[in-house]
């Protein structure tokens, strides 16, 4: 921490955050109540190839049933609160105060977006991420109703392809994401993918 700066004053400026993403770096916190963040540049990066997304048959059925109303950028605060709640299998969360503030600021200037699943007028799942050039950097997702976040992910991939995005960065891979086609790539390969994605501008 910088000398003379209290934890309550710690913040991440939007320009700094976007520069970090442009070089393959992103912030995390150890715990939700941590006053600061640390910066991560993984040796191996998780990505979902937009031409290699795998949709399980059970999810296809759920989508056809039309259970969820999908909205974009409708309730950022609700989505990040859902992601930070740390319920169920995600008993811990890395989303602290500075991260909430930083991504809200990016949302307000058009560089952070949400995909939301609504059911009976309630937000029941969603995800958020950062956009820069033709890249989407997925940050976190949550679900309060079965398959809600999965439907959001499927919608996100379809939307990114339609809009001309070329990179969906998941930061890390998990068994859950691998079911949908997520793979790990070495840092050098990722940086080439990122360089290509930053060459161009598309609208979310």
From Swiss-Prot:
EC number(s) on file: 2.3.2.6
Catalytic reaction equation(s): N-terminal L-lysyl-[protein] + L-leucyl-tRNA(Leu) = N-terminal L-leucyl-L-lysyl-[protein] + tRNA(Leu) + H(+); N-terminal L-arginyl-[protein] + L-leucyl-tRNA(Leu) = N-terminal L-leucyl-L-arginyl-[protein] + tRNA(Leu) + H(+); L-phenylalanyl-tRNA(Phe) + an N-terminal L-alpha-aminoacyl-[protein] = an N-terminal L-phenylalanyl-L-alpha-aminoacyl-[protein] + tRNA(Phe)
Gene3D superfamilies on file: Leucyl/phenylalanyl-tRNA-protein transferase, C-terminal domain, Leucyl/phenylalanyl-tRNA-protein transferase, N-terminal domain
Record has Zinc as a keyword: no
Transmembrane portions of the chain: none
Coiled coil: none
Chief place where the protein resides: cytoplasm
Keyword Transferase in record: yes
GO biological process, one term: protein catabolic process
Top enzyme class: transferase
Subcellular location: Cytoplasm
NCBIfam families registered for this protein in UniProt: aat (TIGR00667)
Role played: Functions in the N-end rule pathway of protein degradation where it conjugates Leu, Phe and, less efficiently, Met from aminoacyl-tRNAs to the N-termini of proteins containing an N-terminal arginine or lysine.
Family according to the record: Belongs to the L/F-transferase family.
Protein name, as recorded: Leucyl/phenylalanyl-tRNA--protein transferase
Biological classification of the source: Bacteria, Pseudomonadati, Pseudomonadota, Alphaproteobacteria, Hyphomicrobiales
Gene name of the encoded protein: aat
